[in-house]
Amino acid sequence: MIRIILFLLTNLAVMLTFSLILAVTGIQSESIYGLLIMSSLFGFSGSILSLIMSKWIALRSVNGRIINHPSNETESWLIDTIRQQSIKKNIIMPQIAIYEAADINAFATGARRNAALIAISTGLLENMTRSEAEAVIAHEISHVSNGDMITMTLVQGVVNTFVIFISRIISQALSSLLSSNRNENSEDEKDSFLFFLISTFLEIIFGVLASIITMWFSRHREFYADASSAKLVGKEKMISALNRLKSSHEPQESDSIIAFCINGKSNSFIELFASHPSLEKRIQALKNKKYM
């Protein structure tokens, strides 16, 4: 995934944009410390931008509707449940949104644990029992209280930094080797373009490989959020909710937010790139109290 993660499209766009800037300005030829600083600046920019804009992006992607005042009994129950769980987790109550979707799903996002958003699909409200929905909400509240969105940003930023840094070190060596026999005065532009092509190619390749790290973290935070939900509302409720997800439609949420959903795309053709563990593994972990 994220698919290759809530972040990857923005991160990739930012990295490629800055790759062009660095190649044109010649920053790649500066000291290794300067390159590391610039790599850190550019590497974290995409992640931080994604985090800051996460609520806006999420609401736009699912066409969510913020619930400020309940219009029916279900919305009243939803607000009360989230308020009570927020108090137990000692966080400010997140904004609440409902979005139209056939699949049973929910997600949490936001730049700060006390300024978060929890969105619930209509499929969840229509197909889950109240106790199951309560467990899913507790799972999302746990993501918020654990600061998973912030941690994910830091992980992605560090990964991006090393992807840019290592790509440019290798690109500098390769482009120098390939252009060593050229006329220095006539081939400067070609050398710069060659460096840009090599570094861009390596950033894409290393970026995909580095997503294994972010996806590993994403899978483990799901286990811990399940365990935290079980502690908050009871293990049986969380297991029942996960079993209910087995009958859900394939998640329709966009790739930019699927990593933050309770019901993710765990059936990736390569498990290393999956943002969520399989439902069977999550249920077994709860039964074994592995992360509790």
UniProtKB/Swiss-Prot annotation:
Statement: the UniProt record of this protein carries the keyword Protein biosynthesis: no
Transmembrane segments: 4-24, 32-52, 150-170, 193-213
Residues binding Zn(2+), per UniProt: H139, H143, E222
Main subcellular location: membrane
Taxonomy, superkingdom: Bacteria
Pfam families, A to Z: Peptidase_M48 (PF01435)
GO biological process: proteolysis
Membrane topology listed for this record: Multi-pass membrane protein
UniProt cofactor note: Binds 1 zinc ion per subunit.
Assigned EC number: 3.4.24.-
Protein name: Protease HtpX
Organism: Buchnera aphidicola subsp. Schizaphis graminum (strain Sg)
